[in-house]
Amino acid sequence: MSTVQAIRTVLFYLLLSASAFVWGTLSFFIAPILPFRARYRFVVQNWCRFAIWLTRVVAGIRYEVRGLENIPEKPCVILSKHQSTWETFFLSGFFEPLSQVLKRELLYVPFFGWALALLKPIAIDRSQPKLALKQLAKQGDECLKKGAWVLIFPEGTRIPVGQMGKFSRGGTALAVNAGLPVLPIAHNAGQYWPKAGWAKYPGTIQVVIGPAMHAEGEGPRAIAELNQRAEAWVSETMAEISPIQQRVSHPEPSVVS
């Protein structure tokens, strides 16, 4: 990384941290009095869009989106490739309102955790995989019924560029049981915002939104088949926009990161 890009990256982190502090402080006082959708727009959507703008202007990371016509009118379960922090910012600012799966322990962090709780996340206990799946099913279904998108990273963690992690069935199970489709999303954000290290590299991220996929039937077999279709689409699309994919050999993730 060049000296200029290193300076731009440091500046990006400084501005992002400062904006998070200011926005977080304002949100702590304003968010509790707002209804959920207005709260989401103020606390999450606006700041995440600012973060993406900052990424473009300061770090030189742009993006292009294909497949906008595939987004269904009714919120459903989003199954996204996970390579970096960028897609969390982008998807949170793009889909509204959106509920994410997170570790339950984060809700106990003073101020930060309390603010998260106001955004109605899906809090799970990752130390107990079976319980986590039940929590995802229950809380996720409640979010969908209230008209919120549910974002799941089925690989369970950020996967290095050029690799694919095995998809957990938690997201497809949630969709099938709710009678809704899954919306697969592929992107190559990790090429410019790597999982490891602090460096950011200028370039254009390709985001591809796939066709909404419905299950054929019900039950475990339908869940597994839908999961395979979603995983295959993401893998094939990643091969088009990113280096050749290589399967990551690790146990199937319990739910998500």
UniProtKB/Swiss-Prot annotation:
InterPro entries found in the cross-reference section: Plipid/glycerol_acylTrfase (IPR002123)
Domain notes from UniProt: The HXXXXD motif is essential for acyltransferase activity and may constitute the binding site for the phosphate moiety of the glycerol-3-phosphate.
Membrane topology: Multi-pass membrane protein
Similarity comment: family membership: Belongs to the 1-acyl-sn-glycerol-3-phosphate acyltransferase family.
Keywords for this protein: Acyltransferase, Cell inner membrane, Cell membrane, Lipid biosynthesis, Lipid metabolism, Membrane, Phospholipid biosynthesis, Phospholipid metabolism, Transferase, Transmembrane, Transmembrane helix
Record-level Gene Ontology MF annotations: 1-acylglycerol-3-phosphate O-acyltransferase activity; lysophosphatidic acid acyltransferase activity
Leftover remarks: Can complement the E.coli plsC mutant.
Listed EC numbers: 2.3.1.51
Protein name, UniProt field: 1-acyl-sn-glycerol-3-phosphate acyltransferase
Catalytic reactions of this protein: a 1-acyl-sn-glycero-3-phosphate + an acyl-CoA = a 1,2-diacyl-sn-glycero-3-phosphate + CoA
Compartment(s): Cell inner membrane
Organism: Pseudomonas aeruginosa (strain ATCC 15692 / DSM 22644 / CIP 104116 / JCM 14847 / LMG 12228 / 1C / PRS 101 / PAO1)
Stretches that traverse the bilayer: 10-30, 105-125
General function of this protein: Converts lysophosphatidic acid (LPA) into phosphatidic acid by incorporating acyl moiety at the 2 position.
Species classification: Bacteria, Pseudomonadati, Pseudomonadota, Gammaproteobacteria, Pseudomonadales
